[in-house]
Every structure is written in structure tokens, then in C-alpha cells.
Amino acid sequence: ASFSRDYEVLATGLSLFEAVLFYTDVGELTKTQERGLLSFVDSGGGFFGLHTAAASFRECEGYHRMLNGFFNGHSPHMKFTVTVSDPGDPITEGLADFEVTDELYYLKHDPGKSHHLLQAYDETRDETHVMAFKHTCGEGRVFFFALGHDMAVLENPNFQQVVLRGALW
């Protein structure tokens, strides 16, 4: 595993990795960096978008097409139940519904292009929103998990299980 805040690695150095995880909403990608990331995924690399990854790089249309999600707001920080949509998937197998206190993300998302794994009901809006999904992109794999605002949710064992399994997928 390696950590970098330098987006230039997207343009030049992803061949050494099996997957990339984004947990950021800072800055923009250059066209070269975006092309490098998209080429990496299209060629068989994995991409894991966590929480603010859907709010990242607002000007990068290719990135958001690859992710199949674009941040469209969130609820107040509140308690809600995360429901398993597909208990037979390796990422969610054996996982029971669980409660968290976090932001409930609203995404612009095409549900027909991804396999939904987790969802949550927002009482404040009387709406159900996808919390985790996966799909392929070219030869690569893309996984997104919307939770992750603060330490309380990061320390939740169910959150950690989904993160680990999503990263391995």
C-alpha cells in the first residue's frame, strides 16, 4: 500500500498498483491525470471511491461517468439504518443491517449501471438512497461507499468490513 496527495501519480505511476482509493474532495485533476486514472481502470485496475470521492473533481466528466455518481448534497449529520440490498454479494455476505451516525449522501446516479449493495432511508426527505454500489468499467472494477464523514463511522466494525471487502473486490 502507498499513500499520496500528489495527483500527478495518476498520470505517470499507476502501473505498480492493483487498485486506487480516493477519499478526497480537494482540487481538480488535469486532463492528463484524469486520462491516466481512466486508462488504469479501463485496463483492469480497481477504483474505490469513499465518501467525498463523489464530490471530487467537479469538472472531470469522465471521472464521474466512471464512478457513476456525483455528489448532490447530503442530510444533516444524523442516525440512520444502512440496509443490505444484496446479502449474497461477497462484499455484503453475512452483513446485517446496521445503524450509523453520518451524513446520508444524495447522488446523481444511474441505478441501471451499477449493482446496489447497501441503501439507507432518509426520513427527512422520505427517500431511499444508495450507500454502496459496484460495477465494471472496461476491464476494471469500480466500488463506491458513501459513508465515512468522521471517526465515529470510521470506527464502526460494519463500516470497516465493507471497506475491507470493497477494497479486495
Set out the residue ranges of the language-model regions:
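Alpha-helical scaffolding within the catalytic cores
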Residues: 4-9, 35, 126-132
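Catalytic beta-strand/loop cores that center a nucleophilic Ser/Cys/Thr
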Residues: 16, 69, 74-139
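Hydrophobic residues in well-ordered beta-strands that form the structural core
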Residues: 3, 49-50, 144
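Aromatic-Pro/Gly-enriched surface loop or interdomain linker
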Residues: 1-18, 168
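Solvent-exposed loop/turn segments at secondary-structure junctions
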Residues: 7-9, 26-29, 53-57, 122-124, ...
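Extracellular ligand-binding/catalytic regions of CAZymes and related secreted enzymes
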Residues: 124-126, 136-169
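Short alpha-beta junction capping motif
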Residues: 14-60, 139
